[in-house]
Structures are given as structure tokens and as C-alpha cells.
Amino acid sequence: MAEITAALVKELREKTDAPMMECKKALTEAEGDLARAEEILRVKLGNKASKAAARVTAEGLIGLYIAADGKQGAVIEVNCETDFVAKNTDFIDFINKLAELVATQNPADVAALSALPFGEGTVETTRTALVGKIGENISVRRFERIQTPNSLASYVHGGKIGVLVEFSGAEEVGKDLAMHIAATKPKALNADGVNAEDIAAERSVAEQKAAESGKPAEIVAKMVEGSVQKFLKEVTLLSQPFVKNDKQTIEQMLKEKGASITKFVLFVVGEGIEKKTADFASEVAAAAAGRA
């Protein structure tokens, strides 16, 4: 059997990005044949990725990119299973490069992004290799791109909340808007952009509360409408009190600064994803079963 040297293991690791021990095992199985060991790893990592794909990815990070000219930008959410992996440098680098790729290549959807050239392969082959290397499922959940003749601003809070803003005005206004949106999480610019289902749900709750008051129908109707309007003011950006000066709304602040906002994108990691929970006893049992 050929000697499995440290240099050989290092070379295979550099080619595949697989963990050191996996490289050594593959070389041993391949009797020192580098090409064969690479193929063995590809199969193993593929199997590992397939097993991981069934697991829930509710953690992750937001990636943001704005071109040097400030006219095109992108925000992307990539999910993983644990917060620990979300801090992995390879994972972070993957996300940042994806955000730039979205901005420059303008893919139609996640499937189109997955097929784009990336490194020595595609986005999808790189993702699969990263799953094998890290040992957790990784999924590209969503992205949005903005191309504008105006200006772009962005803000990321702890890697978990990402905002991209299209606006006209001073750079400081864009920064303030992005930070305000991250803090207050508005649903839309104005009432016209609020989802009809959200309004209907709020109206239903208001009707139930108002009906319990025992007041005349015309008063109940006014109470309901008042509650709905209050809700809309709370969730629409232009109506919200500015976080840096709550005596004026965002709309008033923009008017004062001679600025305007066209669009914003707000991503919150894991928003709407149901996290899998397990009690300690179940986790121990599952781990024991995995070793059996």
C-alpha cells in the first residue's frame, strides 16, 4: 500500500475542501491514488449532503452587496441549521459572494442562481461541497436585487436583519432609513402596499373586540375603522415616527431633507420558518441511535 503522507492529504484537502480526516480515510481507501480518493470523497460528500437536505434550516445570515457606483445592489438570505455554523468563515464568504453574484448577474430565481458559474463549478456544486465540509444543511432561501438611477443604502444588524433601500437624497438619509427599517420592521411604504390578508386579520380582531363593548353599531364601526387605521400607521414606513426624532414621521423627515424613498427590502433570518424542537431526552436517544 502506498504511504499516505501529510503532503498528499493536504493536496486532497485543497482540491476538495473536505475535512482532514475524511481526506485521509479516502486516500487510505484509494490506496494513495489521488484521483480515486477525490471521487470517493465526491460520493461521500454527496451522500452527506443528501442526508443533510432533509433537516430544517432556520438559522443563517443575510448577505448584502452594493456596487461601487451605488446603482445596483442585492440582499440574500442563506440558511443553515445552527447559529454555530452561521459564524463559520467559509459560510460567511459563500453568502457575501452570492450577494455580489445576484447584483451583477441578475438571476431570475434561486434555481437560476444555483446554475450560475461559481469558482470551479456552479453555485449548487459549491453549496453541496460546503454542506459536506461543514456537516449541516445549507439552503439559499431568497434574494432581491435593485437596479436604480437613484441611490442605494443598506444596513445589516448582527447578520440576522438586512435592509436594502432605494432612495433619493443625501447619503445620511439613506443610512437613517435603513437603520430605522431594521429597528421597526415596517410591512410596506404606505397603506397601499400592506397585504390585504394582514388588514383583514387586523379588522377581524378589531371587530371581535368592538362587538364585546356593547355599544351601538355605528360606534362599533368607527371603533373598528379606528383600530385598522392605527394598525396601518404602525406598519407603514412613511407613517411611522422616525426613531431618531419621534416628533416627526418618516414622511415628514424626508420632506424636511428634500429626500424620497422608492422602495425597501427587509429580510429577517428564519422569518416564517418553523424551527424543529426536541427535548433533551429525545436528543440523547437520537444521538445514541445514530451511533448504533
UniProtKB/Swiss-Prot annotation:
Any one GO MF annotation of this record: translation elongation factor activity
Pfam families: EF_TS
Region spans: Involved in Mg(2+) ion dislocation from EF-Tu: 82-85
CDD domains referenced in this protein's UniProt entry, alphabetically: UBA_EF-Ts (cd14275)
Record's keyword annotation contains Cytoplasm: yes
SUPFAM superfamilies assigned: Elongation factor Ts (EF-Ts), dimerisation domain (SSF54713), UBA-like (SSF46934)
Keywords from the UniProt entry: Cytoplasm, Elongation factor, Protein biosynthesis
Gene Ontology CC terms, in alphabetical order: cytoplasm
Domain of life where this protein originates: Bacteria
Entry annotated with the keyword Protein biosynthesis: yes
NCBIfam families cross-referenced by the UniProt entry: tsf
Function: Associates with the EF-Tu.GDP complex and induces the exchange of GDP to GTP. It remains bound to the aminoacyl-tRNA.EF-Tu.GTP complex up to the GTP hydrolysis stage on the ribosome.
HAMAP family: EF_Ts
Name used for this protein in its record: Elongation factor Ts
Protein species of origin: Bordetella pertussis (strain Tohama I / ATCC BAA-589 / NCTC 13251)
UniProt gene name: tsf
